[in-house]
Design a protein with these regions (language model features):
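Alpha-helical transmembrane segments of multi-pass membrane proteins
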Residues: 1-413, 418-429, 444-717
């Protein structure tokens, strides 16, 4: 998202400076529109071929620095061209020499309106019923229709008519020969080089792929391996199931939160009269398991003892009264906000109230038998310390993956080889891997003591829903592992203190203001440009805060998050519309104060939502408040865009295209800064509270700059 915004800003800015010197603007607009459509083909092809082009072996993860550079490469053409198209549209609507802010604002409104419709149609229709290249072809068709309409308007321009006709002919040739499906299959095959892809689907939550090698089926979700059948990882499934269940005398009810199919449920079915509740958010994922005629999957998912729920795990637990003897959390580490919710203090408290007196909660974290790096120790200690703040007893079985056992009763005495074997024999459970020798190795007291000693001197923050420290530690761990050069700089972020960050933020604002002044040498332009950047940044920070908060409270509910983004865009339209209607009466100083006060109200409402999130009635009301807040936040950028254009046009010798390109570019630049700072630094390290502080600083400095500009302009007169 951040890279899309910065590249679009570059496209808007560069074209804004050059467009006045281009004679045939309609022709260039049509060419750009066609190139924009073609750029999607290039981007999708690059996404699926980039590893082969860079000679990166299949299955090898990429570091943060390489991901950053690759996303710039993939998004380069569509983003740059899209930014350029905005400036072109604004210029084409202007007559020669005309400086009409209303027409510029209409371009902004219609572009945002298109984004809303595009987002809703993509989320609710396209992603469900069409492949990626079919979607690309649909976009191509819509753009060609626009070009045809333009060519009829400018029927005398033979170049426009010729290019449109040729492009239309080539497009329909591609459709006639069904090349979109051919390209789809070829690019998927390239991406999964060396494996036979037998199933490929995009659900509203995940990209689901099944490959086949000899007689083995491999399941992938978002390119990450899920499991393989029929040759399952016996060691893993037997450890995480039978070690905890050997402790429980008569287990009756089990809860699986994700990743239960492909071995876990199969082992649980060995226990008599065991009732299993299996929670999986993505229904399409389980439907995929059922489609493939694999014995172990049919046995697991068709068993009478297994109840399937297509829900968010956190939501499910909040709304049931059942007590469980065993809870298995299938996520291996809190690598993002969606998964992090299952490792927070708040969630552990809910879990504690949902397990029986001798109940056990099990999850796993990355580990090592021989060496724990500082970053790996931080990740483990963060989650384990958080669990220890809730559960009376937390035991760790260290290994290549650490098995964490949480309970309200002391189970340490039962974590001995003879006790585990005795418990399994009493329940008539047959196992393949968990023999006495292996258990002596896995439950070795010296290794457990060594692991605990490694964590003793590690200082970490606890993991909360609204302060997701574990997400940062996870990113830090993988950055150290995959991007050692970039890690040297990234690691310094976590050492930042709040006061230090505020100091750096103020210094950055001062430097930014000086840079703007050097380029513009106009006090009005300086304040207007800074306000465009700060408002773009504030809008993005608030929008991310809403999305993060919604995820924390309600999970990764794709439809609702798409709605949040759409309502944010709707707010931009309403803001721009109101500004156009009252262009003469609105003052920038008043708007900045208004935005500042609304930001304070925003966070007060968000705090209220957080404090009352456990109230069952309000829990169903709050999503509507989120939508209202999204409209409010979106209106910030929308309402200031026409005002800033009006001010700069009146106080600048620059042509109108240059002004429009600059304001749009600086608004997007602010959005880019907000996306990077909010998602990587502020939210995971300091929490939502500090996003509020950052917004207050940005808007107060805007007011100070506006006041100084006003004083300076009066003295000049």
């Amino acid at each position: 998202l951040g890279n899309w915004l910065i590249l679009e800003a570059i496209g808007s800015y560069l074209v804004g400076k050059k467009i006045e010197y281009i004679k045939d603007k309609i022709l260039n607009f049509v060419v750009l529109q066609i190139l924009f459509s073609l750029s999607f083909f290039i981007s999708v092809w690059l996404t699926r071929s980039i590893k082969l082009l860079l000679k990166i072996p299949f299955g090898v993860s990429l570091g943060v620095d390489l991901i950053f550079l690759i996303t710039i490469l993939i998004l380069f053409f569509p983003s740059i061209i899209h930014g350029a198209l905005f400036t072109y549209s604004a210029k084409i609507l202007q007559q020669d020499g005309e400086k009409n802010v209303v027409k510029i604002s209409k371009v902004y409104i219609f572009e945002t309106l298109g984004t809303i419709f595009g987002g809703i149609i993509f989320t609710y229709i396209l992603i469900k019923f069409f492949s990626i290249f079919q979607i690309v072809f649909i976009i191509f068709l819509l753009n060609i229709l626009c070009c045809i309409a333009l060519s009829f308007i400018n029927i005398k321009n033979k170049k426009v008519l010729g290019i449109t006709t040729l492009t239309s002919f080539l497009f329909f040739v591609l459709i006639f020969f069904n090349l979109q499906n051919y390209i789809e299959k070829k690019t998927i095959s390239k991406f999964w080089s060396g494996q036979e892809v037998i199933y490929y689907k995009n659900s509203i939550y995940n990209n689901i792929v099944v490959t086949k090698q000899n007689q083995q089926y491999n399941f992938f979700v978002n390119s990450y391996p899920l499991f393989s059948v029929p040759y399952i990882d016996k060691m893993f499934v037997e450890e995480v199931v039978h070690i905890p269940l050997s402790i429980i005398k008569k287990p009756k009810r089990v809860l699986i939160l994700g990743k239960g199919a492909g071995g876990i449920i199969n082992e649980l079915l060995k226990y008599e009269n065991l009732s299993i509740d299996y929670i999986e958010l993505d229904k399409d994922l389980l439907e995929t398991f059922k489609i493939l005629s694999v014995d172990i999957l049919k046995k697991e998912l068709n068993s009478r003892n297994v109840s399937l729920y297509y829900l968010d795990g956190c939501y499910f637990l909040k709304n049931i009264e059942t007590k469980y003897d065993f809870v298995f959390i299938g996520f291996s580490e809190p690598k993002d906000l969606q998964i992090n919710r299952f490792f927070t203090l708040e969630f552990f408290k809910i879990l504690k109230s949902k397990i029986s007196d001798e109940g056990v909660v099990t999850f796993q974290l990355p580990g090592s038998y021989v060496y724990l790096s500082k970053q790996l120790a931080e990740l483990n200690k963060c989650v384990i310390s958080t669990a220890k703040n809730v559960f009376k007893f937390v035991n760790v079985l260290p290994g290549d993956y650490n098995i964490i056992l949480c309970s309200n009763s002391d189970i340490t005495i039962h974590l001995a080889p003879e006790k585990v074997i005795s418990g399994l024999k009493e329940k008539n459970i047959l196992v393949d891997v968990l023999n006495e020798k292996y258990l002596e190795y896995r439950l070795n007291k010296e290794k457990i003591n060594w692991f605990n000693h490694q964590l003793e001197d590690t200082n970490v923050k606890l993991n909360y829903s609204f302060l997701p420290s574990a997400v940062f530690y996870s990113i830090n761990y993988w950055t150290a592992k995959l991007s050692p050069k970039f890690f040297k700089y990234f690691n310094k972020i976590q050492t930042l203190k709040e006061k230090t960050f505020v100091f750096y933020l103020l210094i950055s604002i001062l430097i930014l203001t000086m840079i703007i002044f050097l380029f513009t040498k106009n006090s009005t332009a300086v304040s207007s440009t800074y306000i465009a950047i700060s408002t773009g940044c504030v809008s993005m920070l608030l929008n991310l805060t809403l999305i993060f908060s919604f995820q924390v409270l309600y999970g990764y509910i794709y439809y609702q998050i798409a709605l949040l983004s759409s309502f944010f865009m709707l707010g931009s339209i309403l803001g721009a519309y109101l500004a156009v209607k009252h262009l003469r009466n609105l003052k920038l100083m008043g708007l900045e104060i208004f935005i500042l006060l609304l930001s304070v109200l925003f966070f007060l409402l968000l705090k209220t939502i957080k404090d009352f999130s456990n109230n069952k009635i309000l829990y169903f009301v709050f999503p509507y408040i989120f939508l209202i807040l999204s409209v409010l936040v979106g209106s910030f950028s929308g309402i200031e865009f026409p005002i800033l254009n009006k001010i700069l046009i009146e106080n600048s010798a620059s042509n109108i295209s240059s002004v429009v390109g600059k304001i749009y570019a600086f608004d997007l630049l602010g959005g880019w800064l907000g996306a990077i700072l909010g998602s990587i630094v502020i939210f995971p390290i300091f929490g939502i509270k500090f996003i509020f502080y950052a917004i207050i600083i940005l808007k107060i400095t805007s007011l100070i700059l506006l006041s100084l500009t006003s004083i300076y302009e009066r003295q000049r007169i």
